[in-house]
Amino acid sequence: MYKVALFDLDGTLINSEHKNREAWARLFRRHGVPYDDSVLRSFTGRPAKEAMADHVASFAGHSVDELCAEVAAYAALPDMPAAVTVDGAMELLHQLQQMRVPLGVVTSGPRDYAESALTTLGALQLLDVLITADDVSRGKPDPEGYSTACSALNVEPSQAIVFEDAPAGILAAKRAGIFCVGLTTTHDAEALAEADVLLKDLTEVRWPHIGPS
């Protein structure tokens, strides 16, 4: 039986991918840089600066920091799509807390964003650990975030389970040696093929019977 449950944030507990993708799309349009859906998907589940570094050469005369600040400004505009709670998220968190299962979130977002989003969700006070982009030197798909969470909760990776919606996050969990449940909330099943189990969303979780016994 798993001793701790670790969750990604965006796309796993809250669905802000429409908002995030529109912010990145506005950046590309504003600078006249061609893009398609695969480009926008490449930002999902990764720290903004690391993902932007893959494309900064197309934005002549601009730094990664400048471009990420511009994206953040777009994301804060009132006309952007609103973030919504993923189905089953709060119900599962409350269930696990009542069962005394330690909970953690490992996100590619900065701490101020994560704490604000989790407070709005009503989940921040339920967590035993929160690992953000500010707490690691390498973001997903590097396993550092999930390994750090396991260390903070004093468990071995084999004693944890991760819930993720993005390929980068699934790779991070697997590289950390953790059983990973992929949620098809933002990507299709083919994109999440590295996950150990695939579910539609968190309403399909039947704790603790997930994966091998």
UniProtKB/Swiss-Prot annotation:
Belongs to the HAD-like hydrolase superfamily. CbbY/CbbZ/Gph/YieH family. Requires the presence of a divalent metal cation for activity. Can use magnesium, manganese or cobalt. Keywords: Antibiotic biosynthesis, Cobalt, Hydrolase, Magnesium, Manganese, Metal-binding. InterPro entries: HAD-like_sf (IPR036412), HAD-like_SPP (IPR051806), HAD-SF_hydro_IA (IPR006439), HAD_2 (IPR041492), HAD_sf (IPR023214), PGP-like_dom2 (IPR023198). This is Validoxylamine A 7'-phosphate phosphatase. GO terms for biological process: antibiotic biosynthetic process. It catalyses: validoxylamine A 7'-phosphate + H2O = validoxylamine A + phosphate. The active site is at 8 (nucleophile), 10 (proton donor). Its cofactor is Mg(2+); Mn(2+); Co(2+). Its EC number is 3.1.3.101. Substrate binds at residues 8-10, 107-108, 140. The keyword Hydrolase applies. GO terms for molecular function: metal ion binding; sugar-phosphatase activity. Involved in the biosynthesis of the antifungal agent validamycin A. Catalyzes the dephosphorylation of validoxylamine A 7'-phosphate to yield validoxylamine A. VldH is also able to convert trehalose 6-phosphate to trehalose. A divalent metal cation binds at residues 8, 10, 165. NCBIfam families: HAD-SF-IA-v3.
